[in-house]
């Protein structure tokens, strides 16, 4: 029986977080009125000339440096020629011959095993528009707002062998880009899109099989399902003695299957030639040094620092730094209350629970560090217990309420008057004569029962140590 292995490479398109487009001053803001964020340059009108956005180049270099790439000191743009309704110029300005970054790598880890994935190249290009089908008029409309939005395309080597490795690679890539501030990587808004190049070969076979390209996956889960589906499809073809056709396929996640879109093109099919309206770029060592000097602390370094500086478990540090937003909330809160372990515990337990219940992503979390820190200080000062703190934290999570105001408004503060506690216990003892008798006869469980009844009567708003002390005193006199 033949044993096959899957060979996978990725082309990841990343929308850059610049304020304006790559060759004009139009906004890159997502959404908005149809065809409102475009100009004659975006639309490819005759006589218009592009002006390169410097920030795009800096973002591309920053990404390349973080992925251990060689930076091309003299690079240029090329025209990729093809016709499609969402491409008004009938060509895309991209980079083929001299991409800005080459020969990089990033390290992933799957099931405790580390592996280096090669980065073939990173190149800059402009995005195309968006086609919208109108079912009522039975026609397709074009929104050009996305035309000219700056992209980098990160092309991996075919080094991945499973869906698990692909997801680990994408998650690592996403974190690098988010920590750099290069992109928000929101797949639901199309700012991170991955095309899968997949082929099958027998284990030990040095030559690659015929590859197909998979498109239209809008989540990591969909990508994993698409890989598994295409892997099975190609193996079935080979087992039946058929050939795999080199083509581009569209994944339908609802039907859990893919459909052929078109034959897979090679570079020569696009008739690339140097972009005549943009001069070649020269990237100096001084500029590279400046960009490298602005590089923020990335996820791996931050995770190690959390373990060493804050003394939180490595697992917790990994989860917290696995979201840039969560890491930012953690550090901002710790800077206000100086309780890193407490902050970590609340993020790991209550925050994760509430995120799961609300089906919310950690990157969408809007948790006020000031309110979070205030809550921890209230617990530390003994002004509320942990049961009440959970209730208050849930309100901070949902509506970012001020914990002090919420506690006062709902009367949740701890009872500090020992007289009130004493009076409550006296009533409990009168109502539970049998338990008092049991305690007197050496049944220790009766004491715990009386403590529980007191806490219940006081809605958990009394200090347990104060309850224990007064209860023992009153029982000794009973």
Curated annotation (Swiss-Prot):
Q: Which Gene Ontology terms cover its molecular function?
A: asparaginyl-tRNA synthase (glutamine-hydrolyzing) activity; ATP binding; glutaminyl-tRNA synthase (glutamine-hydrolyzing) activity
EC annotation?
Answer: 6.3.5.-
Q: Which GO terms describe its biological process?
A: glutaminyl-tRNAGln biosynthesis via transamidation; translation
> PROSITE patterns under this entry?
GATB
Domain of life where this protein originates: Bacteria
Q: Fetch the SUPFAM superfamilies from UniProt.
A: GatB/YqeY motif, Glutamine synthetase/guanido kinase
Q: List the disulfide bonds.
A: none
> Quick check: keyword Secreted in the entry?
no
Q: Which UniProt keywords apply?
A: ATP-binding, Ligase, Nucleotide-binding, Protein biosynthesis
Q: Which catalysed reactions does the entry list for this protein?
A: L-glutamyl-tRNA(Gln) + L-glutamine + ATP + H2O = L-glutaminyl-tRNA(Gln) + L-glutamate + ADP + phosphate + H(+); L-aspartyl-tRNA(Asn) + L-glutamine + ATP + H2O = L-asparaginyl-tRNA(Asn) + L-glutamate + ADP + phosphate + 2 H(+)
Relate the assembly described in the record: Heterotrimer of A, B and C subunits.
Q: Which family does it belong to?
A: Belongs to the GatB/GatE family. GatB subfamily.
UniProt function note? Allows the formation of correctly charged Asn-tRNA(Asn) or Gln-tRNA(Gln) through the transamidation of misacylated Asp-tRNA(Asn) or Glu-tRNA(Gln) in organisms which lack either or both of asparaginyl-tRNA or glutaminyl-tRNA synthetases. The reaction takes place in the presence of glutamine and ATP through an activated phospho-Asp-tRNA(Asn) or phospho-Glu-tRNA(Gln).
How is this protein named in the record? Aspartyl/glutamyl-tRNA(Asn/Gln) amidotransferase subunit B
Species name: Lachnoclostridium phytofermentans (strain ATCC 700394 / DSM 18823 / ISDg)
Q: What is the lineage of its organism?
A: Bacteria, Bacillati, Bacillota, Clostridia, Lachnospirales
Gene name per UniProt: gatB
């Amino acid at each position: 029986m033949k044993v096959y292995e899957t060979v996978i490479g990725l082309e990841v398109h990343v929308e850059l977080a610049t304020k304006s487009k790559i060759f004009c001053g139009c906004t890159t803001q997502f959404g908005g009125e149809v065809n409102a964020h475009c100009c004659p340059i975006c639309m490819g009108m005759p006589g218009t000339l592009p002006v390169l956005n410097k920030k795009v180049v800096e973002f591309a270099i920053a990404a390349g440096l973080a992925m251990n790439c060689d930076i091309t000191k003299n690079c240029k743009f090329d025209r990729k020629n093809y016709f499609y309704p969402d491409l008004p110029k009938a060509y895309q300005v991209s980079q083929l011959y001299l991409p800005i970054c080459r020969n990089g790598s990033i390290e992933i880890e799957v099931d405790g095993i580390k592996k280096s994935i090669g980065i073939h190249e990173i190149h800059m290009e402009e995005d195309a528009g968006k086609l919208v089908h109108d079912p009522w008029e039975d026609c397709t409309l074009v929104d050009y707002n996305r035309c000219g939005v700056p992209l980098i395309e990160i092309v991996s080597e075919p080094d991945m062998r499973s869906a698990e490795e692909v997801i680990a690679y994408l998650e690592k890539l996403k974190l690098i880009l988010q920590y750099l501030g290069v992109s928000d990587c929101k797949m639901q808004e199309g700012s991170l899109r991955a095309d899968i190049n997949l082929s099958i070969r027998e284990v030990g076979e040095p030559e690659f099989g015929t590859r197909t390209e998979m498109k239209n996956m809008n989540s990591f889960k969909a990508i994993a399902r698409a890989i598994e589906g295409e892997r099975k499809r190609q193996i079935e073809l080979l087992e039946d003695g058929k050939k795999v056709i080199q083509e581009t396929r569209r994944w339908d996640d609802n039907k859990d299957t893919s459909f052929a879109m078109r034959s897979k093109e090679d570079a020569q099919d696009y008739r690339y030639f140097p972009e005549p309206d943009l001069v070649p770029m020269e990237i100096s060592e001084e500029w590279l040094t400046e960009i490298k000097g602005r590089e923020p602390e990335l996820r791996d370094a931050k995770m190690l620092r959390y373990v060493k500086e804050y003394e939180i478990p490595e697992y917790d540090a990994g989860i917290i730094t696995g979201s840039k937003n969560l890491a930012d909330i953690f550090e901002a809160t710790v800077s206000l209350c100086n309780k890193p372990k407490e902050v970590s515990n609340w993020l790991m337990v209550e925050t994760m629970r509430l995120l799961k219940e609300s089906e919310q992503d950690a990157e969408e979390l809007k948790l006020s560090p000031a309110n979070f820190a205030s809550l921890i200080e209230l617990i530390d000062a003994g002004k509320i217990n942990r049961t009440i703190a959970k209730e208050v934290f849930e309100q901070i999570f949902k509506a970012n309420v001020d914990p002090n105001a919420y506690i006062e408004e709902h009367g949740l503060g701890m009872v500090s008057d020992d007289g009130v506690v004493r009076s409550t216990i006296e009533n409990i003892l009168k109502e539970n004569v049998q338990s008092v008798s049991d305690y007197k006869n050496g049944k220790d469980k009766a004491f715990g029962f009386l403590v529980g009844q007191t806490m219940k009567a006081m809605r958990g708003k009394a200090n347990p140590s104060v309850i224990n002390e007064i209860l023992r005193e009153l029982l000794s006199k009973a």
